Regions:
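Amphipathic, charged alpha-helical segments and their helix-to-coil junctions
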Residues: 2-49, 53, 72-112
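Short, well-ordered alpha-helical segments
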Residues: 54-70
Length: 112
């Protein structure tokens, strides 16, 4: 499952970058992505559905990979998933490009 998730992430990467660049996706503080309306999604319902579908896939893939990390690391148990998600969120914020939306650990949204 994790390999398929990584492959799908690679396939969707350009779309994710575009959506983050146009501010209809942002990096949440739990390692997942959040949807935001923008001018394009408000005017074009098909585009909005596409963004939401890709968002759903990306979040599923991220969770699959994080769950695999927890399952295969002897230092983690299932209850450590939220901690691993926070670590992932921190890395995602660090790797976000200037102008992208990011959420702090405290839940505050800002633009990097």
């Amino acid at each position: 499952m994790a390999l398929k998730a990584i492959q799908r992430q690679e396939f969707n990467r350009d779309d994710i970058l575009e959506f983050k660049n146009t501010l209809c996706l942002g990096e949440r503080n739990d390692g997942l992505l959040k949807y935001f309306e923008n001018e394009h999604t408000l005017k074009d319902s098909d585009y909005k559905m596409f963004v939401v579908a890709i968002l759903k896939e990306e979040n599923e893939d991220r969770l699959t990979i994080l769950e695999r990390i927890v399952a295969t690391n002897e230092n983690f148990s299932d209850k450590d998933l939220p901690k691993v998600q926070k670590i992932s969120a921190s890395l995602n914020r660090e790797n976000a490009h200037a102008g992208e939306k990011i959420q702090s650990d405290e839940g505050v949204w800002s633009t990097k």
